[in-house]
């Protein structure tokens, strides 16, 4: 509220509100996905320890089983942080590019996150590549659902009007459609290129972007649903809006 234009705090302008809302939404989605993956890993470690593995063995296997989710989070969260820092500079205006303001160091610190711990390009390709390898080894059924989606597209579409009266029903329907898109892309790619798929980096990166959007959006919805049941829709109104 310190910066003003036409005697009005810039935080009152719609263009600035959109930027702040996008930052808050991306942060919430990233936080939700991180909590989700961390809980899944924690549960898997406990399950393996109960099965007789040492703690070290359980940790290694537990994290390994959720390596895809970890790659997704590394890409999504590092890019969200970068976008927040970038928009922060935009909000500060010319001052934001100066070392005297906090945004200059925030942007520089955020930028390196897309490079270390495996570049985001590598992590994108890894996320889809690992999923495809699991499918080819029979650990995950990818081709079955992909074939079902292809058959569905060849069939007669439903002309019924969906009921979106239930909370998040429309958002869940959108995620379900995104999953079908991913299955079509990934399934077709596996059928066409097989083991050589890893050579087609552009395709892997494009498929990874779909996978990332699915995981982040679904995580935010799952968290909000849980909190609505724990409290109320009124108390979670901001999170629902996100």
Where are these regions (language model features)?
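Flavin-dependent oxidoreductase catalytic core characteristic
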Residues: 1-242
């Amino acid at each position: 509220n310190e910066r003003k234009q036409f005697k009005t705090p810039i935080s009152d302008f719609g263009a600035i509100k959109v930027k702040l809302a996008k930052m808050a939404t991306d942060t919430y989605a990233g936080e939700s996905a991180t909590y989700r993956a961390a809980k899944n890993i924690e549960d898997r470690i406990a399950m393996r320890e109960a099965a007789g593995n040492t703690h070290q063995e359980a940790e290694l296997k537990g994290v390994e089983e959720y390596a895809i989710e970890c790659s997704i989070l590394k890409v999504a969260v590092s890019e969200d942080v970068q976008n927040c820092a970038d928009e922060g500079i935009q909000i500060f205006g010319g001052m934001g590019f100066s070392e005297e303001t906090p945004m200059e160091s925030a942007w520089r610190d955020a930028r390196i996150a897309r490079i270390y711990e495996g570049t985001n390009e590598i992590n994108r390709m890894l996320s889809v590549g690992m999923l495809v390898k699991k499918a080819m080894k029979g650990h995950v059924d990818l081709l079955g659902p992909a074939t079902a989606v292809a058959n569905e597209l060849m069939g007669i579409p439903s002309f019924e009007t969906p009921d979106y009266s239930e909370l998040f029903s429309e958002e869940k329907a959108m995620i379900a459609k995104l999953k079908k898109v991913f299955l079509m892309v990934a399934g077709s790619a596996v059928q066409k290129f097989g083991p050589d798929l890893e050579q087609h980096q552009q395709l892997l990166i494009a498929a990874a972007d779909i996978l990332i959007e699915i995981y982040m959006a679904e995580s935010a919805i799952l968290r909000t649903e849980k909190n609505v049941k724990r409290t109320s829709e009124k108390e979670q109104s901001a999170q629902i809006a996100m």
